[in-house]
Regions:
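Conserved loop->alpha-helix
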Residues: 1-204
Length: 204
């Protein structure tokens, strides 16, 4: 996560977001993740940019809960020359989770199909923030949020009942896909969509 921006408006599917850092060398058509949801820049100025978002995407992500004036987590697409400081994040929302306990020990409830991809000390993305799983639970997970992360992202303001965008580690999905050929038919449980498909209004 690079910058904590702010939603200025949402009108007829057009988001306008105030920001500065993520606009460095930006160009029309480039991608910026908004709370973990990858969107395309369609217009920008010195301290703002705009993206179009469909009603389906809004309804299937935590963007449905964001209102003008709210803070939002922003991050540009990584380049080959950038340091990879966390795990690989694609900006493809796998599911929406619900906050059960706030920071510092953030607990999130997730759809049952997602729990198989969560492991202790594994990686998960919450509203675009790359985090390490502390406990993998039957119905979700917990992550430890340090004061710095709470202060420079939206996670510090999350309260029980709030919705968050979730993206699991893509490597887990690829491993599951590769191993499927070696699993006896009927044993594997349904999982989330395979990488590169569209599910729940978001590219996975």
């Amino acid at each position: 996560m690079e910058e904590l921006g702010r939603l200025e408006s949402l009108d007829n599917g057009r988001l306008r977001i105030s920001a500065t850092q993520v606009l460095d060398d930006v160009a029309i058509g480039e991608s910026i993740a908004v709370n973990g949801c990858c969107l395309t820049v369609v217009a920008f100025g010195d301290d703002w940019w705009e993206a179009d978002v469909s009603d389906e995407t809004i309804s299937r992500t935590s963007l449905a809960m964001v209102h003008p004036g709210d803070g939002i987590n922003l991050e540009r697409a990584v380049t080959v020359s950038d340091r990879l400081g966390g795990h690989i994040v694609q900006g493809h929302v796998d599911a929406v989770g619900e906050v059960v306990e706030p920071v510092p020990d953030l607990r999130v409830r997730v759809p049952a199909a997602l729990t198989r991809y969560l492991v202790e000390k594994g990686s998960v993305t919450v509203d675009g923030v790359s985090l390490t799983v502390v406990d993998a639970l039957d119905d979700g997970f917990t992550v430890a949020i340090i004061p710095h992360t709470a202060g420079v992202t939206t996670l510090g303001a999350k309260r029980p009942g709030d919705l968050v965008n979730l993206e699991v580690d893509v490597m887990a999905k690829y491993v599951e896909k590769l191993m499927a050929a070696y699993v006896e038919p009927g044993i594997a449980e349904p999982g989330i969509a395979e990488p590169g498909t569209v599910e729940n209004g978001a590219t996975t």
